[in-house]
Amino acid sequence: MQDAPQEEDVPDVSALFPEAPPECHRTLDMVLRAGLKASFRLLPQARPRLEEIAQACDCEVDAIAQIALYKGKTSKKPYLVIASGKRTMKERALAAAIGEVLQRSNDEATMQLTGFAPGMIPPLGLTMRLPVLMDANLNRFAQIWCHAGTPNAFIRVSTALLARAISARSIKPDL
């Protein structure tokens, strides 16, 4: 296992990704601190559809991670759920994975717990560390595209290395 980069070893985000808006810097910085290699893409559309993202990033729609915040219905414990493309995570699959029914968090809770609005949550750079449930279908891809902190900014990272960096638990979404 590789040691995390030291402060002086982490490149300057704005120098490495000059096209990245400031809202993406925290995410990109955490990607670099996790030792991940990433590609960055800023799309011209303000809120691109999945098909537009796939075309611009030259990938399948299912290689785009859709990230949302859920909470336990009883415990209220928050979970970051990463789904593959247009797929949705079935409630019974989530419940089977953690032993509790989950419900999607509202916009205010999402913003408070992640630091990002719904629909643009990145996998890294959140305001707090959260348990992560990741769609096993994403493992079909060596690399996936994720939001980088704005609706039109994306990073491409290694699926396996990202899963390890965020301690994601792989689950089958359609039990």
Task: Describe the residue ranges of each PLM region.
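Extended, low-hydrophobicity, polar/charged segments
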Residues: Q2-L175
